[in-house]
Amino acid sequence: MSVKVLYKTTATATGGRDGTASTADGAFSVKLATPKELGGCGGAGNNPEQLFAAGYAACFIGAMKAVAAQGGGVKVPADASVTSTVGIGPRSEGGFGLDIDLADSLPGLARADAEALVEKAHHVCPYSNATRGNVDVRLTVV
């Protein structure tokens, strides 16, 4: 696979799930905390699954806009939203894996148009391409 890189970013984490993470440019810094469900104290802070969910949701809206801009005959509504729900748990093959639901809200679009846009975006979105074949991702138009 070949990618013509247009943008790169660098982030560093220290302390694992109970540490901190920040980007090299200083634009983003976050305190991390392990959820109770994963054996942590569930204290103040975010976890990798939350960060992944936020990133995937934002990226998927961008993918829908890119598809629409290519002349798909539809426009992504200004109030469109994507709700990404990311679960984590043990895999039957060993190790841990993710399980993802993307609920796409496209007010004002006909259901068939919305579903077609979401399906096309799923083939454009970098997160979708990174997870394809490795993670169960369910798409729903709400």
Model-derived segments and spans:
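Extended beta-strand/beta-hairpin segments
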Residues: M1-A54, I61-V142
